[in-house]
Amino acid sequence: MKALILAGGFGTRLRPLSCTRPKMMFPIANRPLLDWVIEGLSKKGVTKAVLAVNYMADVIKKNFGTSRYGVKIAYSHEKMPLGTGGPIKEAEQLLNENEDSFFVLNGDILSSIDYSKLYEVHKALGAEATIALREVEDPSRFGVVEINGNNQILRFVEKPKIEEAPSKLINAGVYVLNQSVFDIIPSGKKVSIEREIFPILASKRSLFGNRFNGLWIDIGKPQDYITANKLILEEIANEKPFLGKNVKMSSKAKIIPPVAIGSGARIAEDTLIGPYSSIGDNVTVSKGSRIQGSIIFPKAWVDSFASIKDAIIGEGAILGHWVKIEDQCIIGDHAIINDNVTLTQKVQVCPSKEVDTSVLQASTVM
């Protein structure tokens, strides 16, 4: 089986972190998001993944090369942003070998979807396209379907007002498509598969859905990213911390799982790490500091008696003595937060910016 992973997005809602890396390279439990996606595909029989890349494509290529977990990797490079449908047409030559159906995945979705089961359902239904469906309380952020008793999708409505949604079943960002779908996607232009292609298939009565339960999260906003990290930590490190190589940790440090600590990290005495925290490779956490519910990118420095809660700290950032950062604040790569500064209420600090006064309401420090 083959899969196309849409990996070209700009990740604008995750700035400033996405200013310096593509979203697919964001670490979750100290592994890139894309690594988790490809591993999940490999476990369900996918043998080839085509990555539709655009923004910072070279970073992805350098890190993933031509194979991972036994899955061969090829690249389809968009010369300009082509939406969610255009990349499918662009990758046609890489996907039209042998099999008559293939997967398409939104690359920023983390899920436990059983790909092999979805493929079997698609074949059994005789569908031209099958969408994995997920029930949510608020469908207004997503594509919403109206479905009949035969799992046939009658209508597809992209991001409706909540009172106008035909159901609470949303497009989970994973599809099985037949080769015939290539024929209805125009070449060389920006196309929305949700707004332009799925309605055509629904009108032909060849679009079906398959509901699933289990892990599913769309990593679109900072809180979603923090939540995804927590969910994966629960799976891999719920009873004891997941440690990389050559971690130097004081016997007087307190670790509350689930926690992941990367290779070469240094954890000093009287620190409290966890629960639900990822400490990246070569991070230093100094005496008396506390890190809870947060993601610390590699090579960051956390000085003594700092407090970090529900925040994201970029690569190489430096946090001074008695710094307090909480409530979904994002610190860009190589930023410097000076001693005694407090940041709260979703403050965003741009890369390499130095902050020497507290900011207590939502804003961007540029």
Where are these regions (language model features)?
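A structural signal for short hydrophobic beta-strand segments in well-ordered beta-sheet cores
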Residues: 25, 144-147, 198, 209
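Extended, small-residue-rich solenoid/repeat segments and analogous flexible loops
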Residues: 189, 202-293, 299
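Glycine-rich hexapeptide-repeat left-handed beta-helix
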Residues: 286-366
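Conserved N-terminal catalytic core of the sugar/cofactor nucleotidyltransferase
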Residues: 2-5, 27, 31-106, 110-117, ...
